[in-house]
Design a protein with these regions (language model features):
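Enzymes that bind and transform nitrogen-containing heteroaromatic metabolites
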Residues: 1-169
Length: 169
């Protein structure tokens, strides 16, 4: 099972504004929708899940199998939404559902949890030409470090770049 973190971010490393707003370009949104639709699953933190649910994002993703890592995992989500207490449990559920890749879609705390537990195999970053003065970082405060190997760098559009890294273990 390959675990892949997929995030959009600004040039200065933010994945959202402080209020959770994500004003990404069409190139980033289209890249994100296609990436998740092709794989059929996504693992989210509770806040990111709520923001996406409120914005009707799951319809645009063809209602993928969604695993939400939450401190209250007993919450019911629906046919394709499963709540779990930890990143390791999220990966187990995705694998049990028959997927070969688990897609981690944020937020910052969840990303840090996957990094800290050594679960990430690859990272895709779509870099939009934006700067946020303040915001939510790619990884919440963590003392965990990782070395990466660049596998590919491609343009999604004239101004937007996709970086693909392997996490070295």
């Amino acid at each position: 099972m390959k675990v892949v973190l997929y995030m959009a971010m600004t040039v200065n490393g933010y994945i959202a504004k402080e209020n959770g707003d994500t004003p990404w370009s069409d190139a980033v949104w289209n890249g994100y929708y296609n990436f998740v639709k092709k794989r059929g699953n996504i693992i989210l933190g509770k806040r990111t899940y709520e923001l996406m649910k409120d914005a009707n994002e799951f319809e645009k993703l063809n209602f993928p199998t969604t695993v939400v890592v939450s401190n209250s995992p007993d919450k019911q989500g629906g046919d394709k939404t499963i709540f779990v207490p930890s990143p390791k449990e999220a990966v187990r559920v995705v694998k049990e559902k028959g997927f070969s890749e688990a897609i981690v879609g944020g937020g910052s705390k969840l990303n840090a949890g996957f990094l800290k537990e050594g679960l990430l195999d690859e990272i895709y970053l779509d870099i939009d030409p934006l700067l946020f003065g303040k915001g939510i970082k790619l990884f919440d405060e963590t003392d965990t470090e990782a070395k990466l190997e660049l596998l590919a760098a491609n343009n999604l559009s004239k101004n937007t770049l996709r970086l693909h890294y392997k996490v070295l273990k």
